[in-house]
UniProtKB/Swiss-Prot annotation:
EC number assigned by the record: 5.6.1.7
Stored Pfam families: Cpn60_TCP1 (PF00118)
Binding sites annotated in the UniProt record for ATP: 29-32, 86-90, 414, 495
Location of the protein in the cell: Cytoplasm
Protein name as annotated: Chaperonin GroEL 2
Gene: groEL2
Catalytic activity: ATP + H2O + a folded polypeptide = ADP + phosphate + an unfolded polypeptide
Family that this chain belongs to: Belongs to the chaperonin (HSP60) family.
Amino acid sequence: MAKMIVFDETARRALERGVNALADAVRVTLGPKGRNVVLEKKFGAPQIVNDGVTIAKEIELEDPLENTGAQLIREVASKTNDVAGDGTTTATVLAQALIREGLRNVAAGANPMSLKRGMEKTVAKLVQEIAAMAKPVEDNKTIAEVATISSGNDEEIGQMIAEAMDKVGKEGVITVEESKSLVTELDVVEGMQFDKGYVSPYFVTDTERMITDLDEPFILLTDKKISIIQDLIPVLEKVARAGRPLLIISEDLEGEALATLVVNKLRGVLNCVAVKAPGFGDRRKAMLQDIAVLTGGDVISEDIGLKLENVTIDMLGKARKVTITKDKTTIVAGTDNKAAVEKRIAQIHKQMEDTDSDFDREKLQERLAKLAGGVAVIKVGAATETELKDRKLRIEDALNATKAAVEEGIVPGGGTTLLHLTKKIDAIKAGLADDEKTGADLIARALEAPLRQIADNAGVEGSVIAQKVRELDFNIGYDAMKGEFVDMLAAGVADPAKVVRSALQNAASIAAMVLTTEVLIVDKPEKKKAGAGAPDMGGMGGMGGMGGMGGMM
């Protein structure tokens, strides 16, 4: 396919138009008085969202040059979401401000590479400042405040997440499910999470969030590497007849076996997912046994004379729900195996007492936490499907923000921390060369952008509010919900330091890339021929039967 090649200022301005198109759509959601965005869906009702990364992922521009800019800024939101789980809108607003100011300087003759170096050095110093000023999260009240702010000032969600963390611990597993009722409620159940995800992305059931949800699945546990489909066919046929999904946890699954499972999943013959067993060596066998106890199944191992071809339904584990991402599996078990789980916990306690090795004791402690901690499930209720999806996204954001706050502490929220960091820029500039100082000035101007946007969305003049806050003490900021200047931490308006840090780092990274771009190469759009309608395709004919499970052989 032919390519379009665009140079110099034309290339950078095209990127900027794309950046602005996406950022202008996202930034209206920032702050407690931010508005919503409605996303049209090809199937089903439109989706109403207030989440930066969800909006960013939906935007595709017609002009390929501008679309490249939009994709770059989408990367800012995605990366911030991956690292911190929240702060995607803040990152987008920062990146837009940096690119706008930076391109103005490049057009005026500043050296882009010097600007880039200045920005990088300044951000590195500011990240250290954020870490130094972060206050650790030590009580439930602070956790509730962070969750409330991140969920769009929903106090019910804030209290629920604080309660969930209290019940399963700060390292515990908290999942979010859709409820059948109108009420949002918290449920703590037996369950565990381990650090292995699906072996193939073809297993996902939700392509937007790239996760797999299995309701009431059977679970096949084996310490064997599976590569031949013949071994699995008997158990697959039994599960298919039962009409329930299947989770396979094995040492590995590859080759013909993996290909056949993927094909049958895509055809809708059997909803199945394969994940690798956690741990290594003897520890892997012990963890498989833990999962077996939790789910009421057996580990299929030739060490004890069990073979895959002889597996019966009774040997399979069962769970209420399983959620799998690319790197994590969460099993929410029923309550049927409580006695067996308690017996297993007592056994692990005994092993911990008997061992002399600190390493072994640490690993046993990890297993114990996985088994004993349980899983807190927040069941999201709402009056309509559209509200339910929006509420679920808000709760997931709040949950991520809370975990980030526990990890790296909190700083004053509402864009206050970023704005007050501008006071540190002069000291940083003292160690920079000429054009590098301009890079530091770019960062200083961009740091105002989130607070200005929060104020604008609240219906007041952003530049006036920013100027007033700059003159106040470090903790004092603008509470857009009440329209007052307050001590942000005392008022419960806090941001996780990790979210603020990630937003700044990712925004500066992408902005530096845009400023140092000299050539843009994209596919040339194909011109549609006038009057060329689609030819008559004729009838499609029937699809034919898919055959039974024997088609896998």
